[in-house]
Swiss-Prot record:
Disulfide bridge partners, by residue number: none
Annotated GO MF terms: UDP-N-acetyl-D-glucosamine:N-acetylmuramoyl-L-alanyl-D-glutamyl-meso-2,6-diaminopimelyl-D-alanyl-D-alanine-diphosphoundecaprenol 4-beta-N-acetylglucosaminlytransferase activity; undecaprenyldiphospho-muramoylpentapeptide beta-N-acetylglucosaminyltransferase activity
High-level lineage: Bacteria, Pseudomonadati, Pseudomonadota, Alphaproteobacteria, Rhodobacterales
Membrane topology category: Peripheral membrane protein
Top-level class of the enzyme under EC nomenclature: transferase
Protein family membership: Belongs to the glycosyltransferase 28 family. MurG subfamily.
Keyword flag Ligase: no
Identification of the protein by name: UDP-N-acetylglucosamine--N-acetylmuramyl-(pentapeptide) pyrophosphoryl-undecaprenol N-acetylglucosamine transferase
EC number: 2.4.1.227
One Pfam family from the record: Glyco_tran_28_C
Organism annotation: Paracoccus denitrificans (strain Pd 1222)
HAMAP family with a match to the protein in the record: MurG
Length: 362
């Protein structure tokens, strides 16, 4: 009896890279694959949620984007050491397929797969390809795209798989939407894994100026940085608004399913969650994101009517208040936005990725 095939998954050390990598790992394990995660020391700290059956391989990598002059000089040597280590590991236990999810920690594994001529693919979560995925886009067999359309290098064809989401999100996929009416109104404010200061600055002020009839019915769940939480709590309290403010919500899928409106950054994982559950959104793309990729991520929601996009360059409390008021006072519009979000969802994204992995073994 032959051993189960091995898929090596290479992912960087942020939630945006790790969530879809984890979803693919879980799907492949359920289909009888062996799975190994390749990352660097930073990425290994984010791998705790991966199934215990996933083997871990920590390799040396580095980026020129951070550190001083000496650290930058050491980058080629650290990457080179990582590539050699990855080649040795792959020769000892050769993967059938190598999948990269972006981020500099994927460089050693993707380079080793290229040298050893192992079938390989990348998954790009955002609407504008990151630097590492861009470097490998012409050197892989498949390019899977989480956001559509994705800006790709000339001559490269992408396959729209969507961005895999956590099981807790899938459990609430298409949950019935309760449109805003005369009862209570739930608002969810999320800004990525560490919150977003601009949302902590703007949202409480915007809500405080809403008509009394609407403001007094609001219940807010607001994800804020730990250092901002105290002042955000005080701002809501002074406006008489019921609010739960935390640095991290471990039940975001449930709060998303319960809300009438979500105000969010436009990270790929957040947008995937919003579309799979299906909720109206006000999106505020992170202006400093590489290549302005969050604006690209938000484009499909804006064009379909599922979301309103407010660039940071024009964001103020009044514009945010206006959009909140317009959505929460119009039940028909809010319902249509929720339905439009669902049309963009790819709840089977992990399976689509797994199918591409299997395809590469034939």
């Amino acid at each position: 009896m032959s051993a189960a095939p091995l898929c090596l998954i290479a992912a960087g050390g942020t939630g945006g890279h790790m969530f879809p990598a984890q979803s693919l790992a879980e799907t492949l394990l359920a289909q009888g694959w062996r799975v190994k995660l390749s990352t660097d020391e930073r990425g290994a700290r984010y791998a705790g949620a991966f199934p215990a059956e996933v083997a871990r391989e920590v390799v040396s990598s580095a980026t020129t984007a951070r550190g001083g002059a000496l650290a930058r000089l050491a980058v080629p040597f650290r990457i080179g050491a990582g590539v050699l280590a990855a080649i040795r590991a792959m020769r000892a236990d050769r993967p059938a397929v190598v999948v990269g999810f972006g981020g500099y920690p994927t460089i050693p594994a993707m380079s080793a797969a290229l040298v050893l001529r192992i079938p390989r693919m990348i998954h790009e979560q955002n609407g504008i390809m990151g630097r590492v995925n861009m470097a490998f886009a012409r050197r892989v067999d498949r390019v899977a795209c989480g956001t559509w359309p994705t800006r790709l290098p000339p001559g490269v064809q992408g396959i729209h798989t969507g961005n895999p989401v956590r099981q807790a999100v899938l459990d609430r996929a298409g949950a019935p939407y309760v449109p805003p009416g005369e009862g209570g109104l739930n608002l969810l404010v999320i800004g990525g894994s560490q919150g977003a200061r601009v949302l902590s600055d703007m949202v409480p002020e915007a809500i405080a100026g809403l008509p009394d009839e609407m403001r007094t019915r609001l219940s807010v769940s607001h994800q804020a940085r730990a250092e901002d939480a105290e002042r955000v709590i005080a701002a809501y309290a002074s406006a008489g608004i019921s609010a739960v403010v935390r640095p991290f919500f471990d039940d975001v899928p449930q709060r998303l399913a319960d809300c009438q409106l979500v105000i969010s950054r436009a990270g790929a994982s957040s947008i995937a969650d919003i579309t799979v559950i299906g909720r109206p959104a006000i999106l505020i793309p992170y202006a400093a994101a590489t290549g302005d990729h969050q604006t690209a991520n938000a484009r499909a929601l804006a064009e379909s009517g599922a979301g309103v996009v407010l660039p940071e360059s024009v964001l103020d409390a009044e514009s945010l208040r206006r959009d909140m008021r317009d959505i929460l006072s119009d039940s028909a519009r809010a319902t249509a936005m929720a339905a439009a979000a669902l049309t963009l969802a790819r709840p089977d994204a992990a399976q689509r990725l797994a199918d591409l992995v299997t395809e590469l073994t034939r």
